[in-house]
């Protein structure tokens, strides 16, 4: 009985020892397994942690962390790199971004931090005039939408001055607003404001319209009125009242295109100053006339009797008028009369072959005079009567008159 108990006890010890040995072996194996792991620092999308791993490569490590990678992801070092002790592994997941350029959309995956970095990464060439939304310094986020409207050049002819301007505007109206161009309602824009602008079809012509009022002052000619004067010898005239020109203001609406006048319309007239008639007294007194002639010195006077009038020769001649200051005139007659010093002298120019110089005559509508001058254009039955004023000479004009030679 004692022997049997000993045997049983021995078996229990054996089992206990075996169990202890098994536990010891397992612990040793576990310890050995843990001791063979590599210590690695992993940064996942900016979050760092330290792990121990049996992974052979960086790719294996990411798989053990249940990270599904894409070609666009940023992994440092590369996935095929062997794991070493105290290795730093950085993983940045690419984000999906929708990029639209000039209306064409495509989806990209990128680890770029900002819009500008993404465009550089994708080799998208942009100009400072391009419209980029959001701005290039905006941080990239998942499913972000980026829109780029490339700028193009518009040729603007503004009042004849041409310049090229970069823009992303799609219509003429939007372009003018974007450029803050001062356009008046009267200005002409070509093409129309709602016309589309596209690359290669972007020419704008601006015609500047200006409306101004132009006031022009004109002279109003005075009338000449003659009145009979019984106290004045017949054939003589005397200025009773000098004429004075009036002033007329004409208001014109002037339209200019690019500074050049294209139309003018009279909109108003107003008299600024009334004209004043010239009044001439015409003698009607019947008496023996005195004829004043001037010698070559321009000073002496001669009195001629009217008795020759009844026997004088009457002729019909063409007549014109002149003054002392007419073109080509010296102020002195062919017989030496100084007309400038004797403005009231009654003198006519004649053809000496028809009417001798020095003859006393009576000219219809002019009165008594002396044939004291000649002229290169005075040939045959033609005379030129002298007036001290141009206005009187102009009024005489060119007419046919009767002349009586008194001596």
UniProtKB/Swiss-Prot annotation:
Role: Suggested to be involved in cell wall modification.
Coiled coil start-end: none
Keyword RNA-binding: no
Disruption-associated phenotype: No visible phenotype during recovery from stationary phase or sporulation efficiency.
Expression triggers: Negatively regulated by an overlapping cis-acting antisense RNA which itself is positively regulated by extracytoplasmic sigma factors SigM and SigX; when both sigma factors are deleted expression of the yabE mRNA is detected.
Protein keywords: Signal
GO biological process: peptidoglycan turnover
GO cellular component term, pick one: outer membrane
Gene from which this protein is expressed: yabE
Organism listed in the record: Bacillus subtilis (strain 168)
Protein name: Putative cell wall shaping protein YabE
Signal peptide location: 1-31
InterPro entries: 3D_dom, DUF348, G5_dom, Resuscitation_pf_RpfB, RlpA-like_sf
All copies of domain G5, residue ranges: 206-286
UniProt GO molecular function: hydrolase activity, hydrolyzing O-glycosyl compounds
Pfam assignment, any one: G5
């Amino acid at each position: 009985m004692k022997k049997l108990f000993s045997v049983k006890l021995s078996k229990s010890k054996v089992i206990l020892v075996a169990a202890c040995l098994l536990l010891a072996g397992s612990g040793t194996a576990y310890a050995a397994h843990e001791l063979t792991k590599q210590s690695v620092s992993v940064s996942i999308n900016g979050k760092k942690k330290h792990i121990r791993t049996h992974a052979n490569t960086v790719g294996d490590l990411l798989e053990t962390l249940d990270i599904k990678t894409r070609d666009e992801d940023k992994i440092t070092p590369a996935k095929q790199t062997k794991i070493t002790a105290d290795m730093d592994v950085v993983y940045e997941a690419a984000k999906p971004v929708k990029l639209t350029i000039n209306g064409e959309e495509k989806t990209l995956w990128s680890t770029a931090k900002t819009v500008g970095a993404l465009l550089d990464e994708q080799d998208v060439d942009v100009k400072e005039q391009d419209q980029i939304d959001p701005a290039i310094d905006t941080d990239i986020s998942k499913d972000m939408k980026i829109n780029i409207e490339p700028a193009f050049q518009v040729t603007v002819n503004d009042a004849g001055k041409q310049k090229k301007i970069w823009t992303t505007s799609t219509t003429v109206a939007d372009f003018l607003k974007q450029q803050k161009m001062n356009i008046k309602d009267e200005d002409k824009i070509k093409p129309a404001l709602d016309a589309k602008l596209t690359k290669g079809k972007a020419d704008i012509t601006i015609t500047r319209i200006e409306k101004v009022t132009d006031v022009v002052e004109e002279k109003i000619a005075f009338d000449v009125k003659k009145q009979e004067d019984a106290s004045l010898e017949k054939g003589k005239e005397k200025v009773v009242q000098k004429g004075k020109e009036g002033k007329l203001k004409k208001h014109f609406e002037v339209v200019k295109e690019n500074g050049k006048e294209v139309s003018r319309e009279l909109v108003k007239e107003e008299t600024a100053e009334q004209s004043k008639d010239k009044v001439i007294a015409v003698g009607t007194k019947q008496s023996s006339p005195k004829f004043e002639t001037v010698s070559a010195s321009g000073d002496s006077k001669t009195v001629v009797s009217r008795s020759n009038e009844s026997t004088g020769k009457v002729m019909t001649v063409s007549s014109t008028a002149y003054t002392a200051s007419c073109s080509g005139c010296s102020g002195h007659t062919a017989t030496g009369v100084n007309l400038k010093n004797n403005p009231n002298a009654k003198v006519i120019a004649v053809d000496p072959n028809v009417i001798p110089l020095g003859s006393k005559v009576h000219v219809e509508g002019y009165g008594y005079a002396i044939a004291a001058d000649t002229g290169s254009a005075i040939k045959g039955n033609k005379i030129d009567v002298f007036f001290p004023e141009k206005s009187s000479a102009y009024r005489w004009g060119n007419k046919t008159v009767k002349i009586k030679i008194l001596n």
